[in-house]
């Protein structure tokens, strides 16, 4: 049995157009916002005179509400809207790097550069501050580190809520901010400062 070729799905029309509209009369909403109730046959003729389609947009109204528009353009707008929605709903990867409350400056700078890079690429990030042994008594140092991370990453992202303790770990989440990232990239391109290389990354699950 031959496999059927996959076909791209076009936006479904959820309303009637032109001759499909068979009610006696309709309410027309004109581009300037004015309205007029008229016989459907007259509305269809007017649509033809305007070189547009008569499109029913509120079938449950009494009488049904219609407008004059180009069906092809309307379908294109619907397709673009669906495309934009899918982009917004696109899932991002959660990246994670670990710190310790006594992380030195070199290690802090190195790891935050990686977190910054992750955010610039549109990923959410999680900084996990691990308290080994009795270091859990120094929770204030962990919170101070979380504040330093927040300040450092504020150029490309925003912190999600407050840092959260779970056992001997402190979790700090950040999400990318497109406006900040765009501004950051413009400054980078003008100054010519090379971006920090990204060597390895770790994926984490929500």
From Swiss-Prot:
Matches recorded under InterPro entries: T_IF-3_C_sf, T_IF-3_N_sf, Translation_initiation_fac_3, Translation_initiation_fac_3_C, Translation_initiation_fac_3_N
GO cellular component terms, semicolon-separated: cytoplasm
The organism's place on the tree of life at top rank: Bacteria
Molecular functions (GO terms): ribosome binding; translation initiation factor activity
A Pfam family per the record: IF3_C
Any one GO BP annotation for this protein: ribosome disassembly
Family named by the database record: Belongs to the IF-3 family.
Protein's name in the database: Translation initiation factor IF-3
Gene name of this polypeptide: infC
